[in-house]
Amino acid sequence: MSFPYEYIFKYIIIGDMGVGKSCLLHQFTENKFVPDSPHTIGVEFGTRIVDVNNKKIKLQIWDTAGQERFRAVTRSYYRGAAGALLVYDITRRITYNHLTTWLTDARNLTNPNTVIMLIGNKKDLEGQRDVTYEEASAFAKQNGLIFVESSAKTGENVEEAFLRTAKLIFQSVQEGNVDLIPDGGITKNPPQTITDKPQDASKCSC
């Protein structure tokens, strides 16, 4: 068989409960908004193949639960993440105030070269905004994060968030800053094409 992609990048999505992590995952992988998406219990998983610099890359995305009682379980999924999407709700300051705790976990439990993207979600609710763009941008700059505001409902900047993260991970690969091993969150498929040996029809029992 031949692989339809050359690399696999592991992502995790982290942040408080109700910030729209699962909605971001569904919007990116299925191009749809699920308004009544139930709160994630443990983890949820999704994949999508994207094109970065003419290379096919499979993104394996782990959406983690935001509730405190699941933190011990979800922390195990941080290991080996090549990219981390740190999400808060621009209409709920409490979710922004908790970013430092989430970021500390990400820094302690992932790799030094993990790309961390800060996402201010629910941009479609501008009239209810409780965290300014400038404030979050300053936080991102201070902590060396990439930053974007998005809307899982309208799809605004969702694609950009995932793809921009993938481009920075791929850049690290090209520069030799990361190891191509599963524990590093990045796997490279063999360059050769593997062909299944056809079965001898004369030996088939039909």
Swiss-Prot record:
Motif (Effector region): 37-45
Result for mutant: residue 67 to L: Constitutively active
One GO-annotated biological process of the protein: defense response to bacterium
Cell location: Endosome; Contractile vacuole; Membrane
CDD domains: Rab14 (cd04122)
Family affiliation: Belongs to the small GTPase superfamily. Rab family.
Protein name: Ras-related protein Rab-14
Species of the source: Dictyostelium discoideum (Social amoeba)
Lineage, opening ranks: Eukaryota, Amoebozoa, Evosea, Eumycetozoa, Dictyostelia
Gene behind the chain: rab14
